[in-house]
């Protein structure tokens, strides 16, 4: 039997039940989920599914990541919610590919762990799966036999507990970018998962940080003193865009905006003064009318023991996020959110500053 797999949280419990129900029969897992976005999230879920399949001794095959096929299916349905026609089209894409893979492998049966998802309508899935199975002369397995509702009820109680016990990645959205946007909008929150960093950094509460956590956990799983997976809530930050201009219509100057710099409408700073800070032993630019602070690249090099030649080099090989927070703490305090901007060199000219940023609470995984 081939089992289409969507994620580890659904996967572990479902595969255990499948192995019990079909004892002695070979089970093949198939990870085909072109709806998952961004690609880094897809890879994170794939890595975790590999872990659960290894735990159970089940072979796992990976399908192609065909995002364009999903986007074609979702066209015109982007604004629909969960359990809508968009989800039905997504089922069609994934279950059709699963049926074709089962047929290719010579399997007679297939099913999907999506049946256990609390975000999906099992009746929609069953109808679609049976329709596709009939076209390919296959059987779509539902674990019914008058016990599917019991199976689903039991799963709802135990799914998250089993995931926590086995330290699996528990994603906070179904997978597609459209569902994520709708979910975040309903919570009045920004979809951080869809934001790419303006600098080459691994940011708190990012998919890249989650990947690091679970890879570290996986590498240490055989250690006697292995760390424990836990969650916490943090107040984190994203810089969306920003810059410094000599006039409203000029090209932006090379600059580096430090982490936790709050949003600024395009403010005009015409009283910029540079003073030598005895406390910091570097030049600092400030205005009596605005709280934005300026450092020169030379000042950054001094404070952070770096040797950047120019701002292009800094932006290509930036300070990591923690270093930026350390620099902020040195200059204006760890709790500060006033803009701090690094310029190539000191300037006495009038400057226009604009910053768009977001502060938001996020629940993150970490290791104890």
Swiss-Prot record:
Residues that hold [4Fe-4S] cluster according to the record = 6-7, 87, 90
> One GO MF term, please?
4 iron, 4 sulfur cluster binding
A Pfam family name for this chain?
A: QueH
Instruction: Quote the pathway field.
Output: tRNA modification; tRNA-queuosine biosynthesis
The UniProt catalytic activity note for this protein reads: epoxyqueuosine(34) in tRNA + AH2 = queuosine(34) in tRNA + A + H2O
Q: Which GO terms describe its biological process?
A: queuosine biosynthetic process; tRNA modification
The record's EC number reads 1.17.99.6
Which residues are listed as membrane-spanning?
none
Question: In which domain of life is the source organism classified?
Answer: Bacteria
Q: Which UniProt keywords apply?
A: 4Fe-4S, Disulfide bond, Iron, Iron-sulfur, Metal-binding, Oxidoreductase, Queuosine biosynthesis, Redox-active center, tRNA processing
Q: Which cysteines are joined by disulfide bonds?
A: 174-176
| Protein family | Belongs to the QueH family.
What is this protein for, i.e. what is its function?
Answer: Catalyzes the conversion of epoxyqueuosine (oQ) to queuosine (Q), which is a hypermodified base found in the wobble positions of tRNA(Asp), tRNA(Asn), tRNA(His) and tRNA(Tyr).
Q: What is this protein called?
A: Epoxyqueuosine reductase QueH
